[in-house]
């Protein structure tokens, strides 16, 4: 008689749902434009060139042809939306100013195809987007007016928030996004963990946190793709993702502006937490487009516990933390 918890009984399309959220027509239009771009990105993933592009991004990483194409698809959509003034992409060296619309209401930071190196082995990848009011992109993530990711897996799904809860939409056979989960919420604590980075390079506090998770029976679930790993933690509502500081990379690997802020926004909206181990991710003031940051995000109690281990010296060399 009753549908599955968190599912919607009747099909609701994305534009209709956004209008029901009582947000501005311009923000509705922008989110729908990004969703529309994803249809072309998934087509490129399924049919496009998997080779290298012969170029590098601002981090010195070799760009794949799919990176470049996905970036172009999304940037063109944003550029012609009529509501965006500044665009920052992980694949671009500097902010792209929309000269045709310098008075645009929003600025957008995005990773066009996170995990693109996984495409050739047919693993899930995704697009990550953060939306800010006005022209300033170097502001704390807490100032975002919207965040979303699109997961290109066995199904294409979009998870978004405009500060009024977290919703999931799934692409149907007509390539339309329809509501599939409403008001996604995380449990206080979970039983899965997704740890990035080489374990032998973890600091002492992070190693103790891992042993704590193992002792309480948490299961390791890590694909190497940021979007699918966060999606698992968020949709299951019971886990923690981390990419910590490493001995040779004290600032971690993931980018604050393009990856961490949007995901932290979504996780907090679902009742979870996100920290660099010392302060909430969303309170960090970015100093540059390419700023990196350690990250712990997921169930609130687990994230708090991670910070405790990181900020509490070990009492004895061989002390095993208790769950």
From Swiss-Prot:
One biological process term in Gene Ontology: sucrose biosynthetic process
GO cellular component term, pick one: cytosol
Protein's cellular compartments: Cytoplasm
Domain of life: Bacteria
Cofactor annotation remark: Binds 2 magnesium ions per subunit.
Oligomer and partners: Homotetramer.
Binding residues for substrate: 114-117, 222, 253
HAMAP family the UniProt entry points to: FBPase_class1
This protein's pathway: Carbohydrate biosynthesis; gluconeogenesis
Keyword presence, Hydrolase: yes
GO molecular function: fructose 1,6-bisphosphate 1-phosphatase activity; magnesium ion binding
Cofactor(s) recorded in Swiss-Prot or TrEMBL: Mg(2+)
InterPro entries recorded: FBPase_C_dom (IPR044015), FBPase_class-1 (IPR000146), FBPase_N (IPR033391), FBPtase (IPR028343), Fructose_bisphosphatase_AS (IPR020548), SBPase (IPR023079)
Lineage: Bacteria, Pseudomonadati, Thermodesulfobacteriota, Desulfuromonadia, Desulfuromonadales
Family the UniProt entry places it in: Belongs to the FBPase class 1 family.
Annotated EC: 3.1.3.11
Source organism of the structure: Pelobacter propionicus (strain DSM 2379 / NBRC 103807 / OttBd1)
Protein name: Fructose-1,6-bisphosphatase class 1
Binding-site residues for Mg(2+) 1, renumbered to this chain: 90, 111, 113
Catalytic reactions of this protein: beta-D-fructose 1,6-bisphosphate + H2O = beta-D-fructose 6-phosphate + phosphate
């Amino acid at each position: 008689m009753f549908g599955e918890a968190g599912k919607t009984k009747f099909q609701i399309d994305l534009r209709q749902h956004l209008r029901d959220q009582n947000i501005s027509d311009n923000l509705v239009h922008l989110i729908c434009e990004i969703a529309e771009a994803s249809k072309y990105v998934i087509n490129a993933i399924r049919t496009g060139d998997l080779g290298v592009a012969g170029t590098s991004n601002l981090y010195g990483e070799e760009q794949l042809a799919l990176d470049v194409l996905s970036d172009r698809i999304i940037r063109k959509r944003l550029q012609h939306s009529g509501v965006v003034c500044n665009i920052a992409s992980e694949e671009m060296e500097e902010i792209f100013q929309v000269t045709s619309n310098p008075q645009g209401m929003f600025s957008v930071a995005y990773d066009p195809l996170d995990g693109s190196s996984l495409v050739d082995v047919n693993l899930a990848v995704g697009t990550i987007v953060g939306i800010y009011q006005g022209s300033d992109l170097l502001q704390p993530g807490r100032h975002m007016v919207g965040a979303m990711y699109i997961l290109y897996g066995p199904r294409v799904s979009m998870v978004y928030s405009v500060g009024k809860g977290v919703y999931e939409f799934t692409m149907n056979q007509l390539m339309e996004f329809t509501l599939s989960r409403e008001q996604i919420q995380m449990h206080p604590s979970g039983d899965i963990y997704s740890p990035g980075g080489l374990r032998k390079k973890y600091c002492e506090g992070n190693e103790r946190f891992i042993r704590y998770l193992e002792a309480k029976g948490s299961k390791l679930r890590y694909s190497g793709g940021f979007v699918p790993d966060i999606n698992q933690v968020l949709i299951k509502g019971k886990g923690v993702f981390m990419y910590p500081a490493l001995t040779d990379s004290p600032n971690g690997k993931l980018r604050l502006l393009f990856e961490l802020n949007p995901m932290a926004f979504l996780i907090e909206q679902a009742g979870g937490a996100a920290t660099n181990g010392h302060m909430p991710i969303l309170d960090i003031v970015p100093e540059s487009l390419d700023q990196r940051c350690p990250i712990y995000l997921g169930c609130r109690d687990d994230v708090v516990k991670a910070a405790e281990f990181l900020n509490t010296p070990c009492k004895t060399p061989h002390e095993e933390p208790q769950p």
